[in-house]
């Protein structure tokens, strides 16, 4: 009898939590409407936030890292706006973009990005900047669409081999399982209560930080991240088989504040700088993996690097 009452109490509590989560989700959708364009690709909605001057030259496309989406690029877009047109978008299943039935490997994400850019009327060429996990799909984009790609910027970007070489055994699997767990618990509001975006949003204005927190509280958010991690080996194979990038302008930014495995992570960033014949490499002093784009001071460094690649792309096009 006692165990039956406990089960009923737990079920009632979970039901109440789910009802509260649903009510808060409805509230958040009213409170935080999409700031950018909503386009449809292959039956699902994609969000693209365009900012900046409509000038000649490449458009900068900003790809967020694992656990984040377009508001994370607020300071970078603001710094670029006077002279460069940029678009920060949300991968399918994150932010204001709806879930895709397609697999979450780097090439598929790149194909969806190309479709969304086309539907939004954002013409090439593009300079693509990827932070963290976002480095994988922007590299896949450059491989699939070299004629559309004018340059790359990798901001403390993931290396395809990082989990194979990581000192902690099964680190990727642990991360994947944790995301699936949080995805299930998302129906009951736990990710909202824990504020899982507090690190990636630290330093952003209150509005953008709140948008990130609301987006991360959606039940499908963590499940989408888990799907990306599950197919990491597929993305790794795709990128390791990619064609050489030649003299494509490339800037690689690493950070000085690294977690466990910092020496390996910095070495991997140096390897990324060997992807092209005309790459620059810089360590952003004082920045961590998250603050390099969420902190305004460090975002200025990122924006400067992006402008440098945009100019290098323009100079390269004039020579060809």
Where are these regions (language model features)?
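Short amphipathic, positively biased membrane-proximal segments
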Residues: 1-47, 51, 56, 92, ...
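Conserved hydrolase catalytic core segment
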Residues: 123-166
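Conserved HGGG/HGGXW glycine-rich cap/lid loop of the alpha/beta-hydrolase fold
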Residues: 50-96
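A catalytic-pocket lid/entrance helix-loop region that shapes and gates access to the active site
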Residues: 154-194
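Catalytic active-site module of serine/aspartate enzymes centered on a nucleophile-bearing elbow/loop
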Residues: 277-320
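Conserved serine/cysteine hydrolase catalytic core
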Residues: 207-285
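Active-site loop/oxyanion-hole signature of alpha/beta-hydrolase fold enzymes
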Residues: 51, 88-129
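Conserved catalytic-core motifs of eukaryotic protein kinase domains, centered on the activation segment
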Residues: 73-74, 97-103, 164-165
């Amino acid at each position: 009898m006692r165990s039956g009452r406990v089960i009923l109490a737990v079920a009632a509590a979970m039901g109440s939590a789910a009802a509260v989560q649903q009510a808060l989700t409805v509230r958040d959708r009213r409170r935080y409407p999409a700031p950018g364009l909503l386009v449809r690709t292959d039956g699902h909605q994609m969000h693209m936030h365009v900012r900046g001057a409509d000038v000649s030259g490449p458009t900068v496309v900003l790809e967020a890292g694992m656990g984040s989406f377009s508001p994370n690029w607020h300071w970078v877009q603001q710094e670029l706006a006077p002279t460069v047109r940029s678009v920060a978008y949300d991968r399918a299943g994150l932010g204001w973009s709806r879930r895709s039935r397609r697999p979450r490997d780097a090439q598929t994400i790149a194909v969806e990005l190309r479709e969304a850019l086309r539907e939004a009327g954002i013409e090439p060429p593009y300079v693509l900047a990827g932070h963290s996990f976002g480095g994988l799909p922007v590299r896949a984009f450059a491989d699939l669409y070299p004629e559309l790609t004018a340059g790359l910027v990798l901001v403390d970007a993931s290396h395809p081999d990082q989990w194979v070489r990581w000192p902690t055994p099964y680190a990727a699997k642990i991360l994947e399982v944790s995301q699936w767990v949080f995805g299930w618990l998302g129906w009951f509001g736990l990710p909202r209560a824990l504020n899982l975006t507090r690190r990636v949003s630290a330093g952003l204005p209150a509005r953008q930080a709140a948008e990130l927190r609301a987006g991360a509280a959606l039940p499908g958010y963590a499940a989408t991240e888990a799907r990306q991690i599950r197919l990491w080996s597929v993305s790794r194979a795709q990128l390791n088989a990619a064609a050489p990038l030649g003299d494509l302008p490339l800037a690689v930014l690493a950070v000085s504040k690294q977690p466990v495995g910092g020496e390996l992570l910095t070495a991997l960033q140096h390897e990324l700088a060997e992807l092209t014949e005309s790459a620059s490499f810089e360590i952003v002093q004082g920045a961590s993996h998250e603050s390099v784009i969420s902190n305004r001071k460090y975002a200025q460094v990122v924006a400067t690097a992006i402008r440098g690649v945009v100019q290098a792309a323009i100079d390269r096009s004039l020579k060809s």
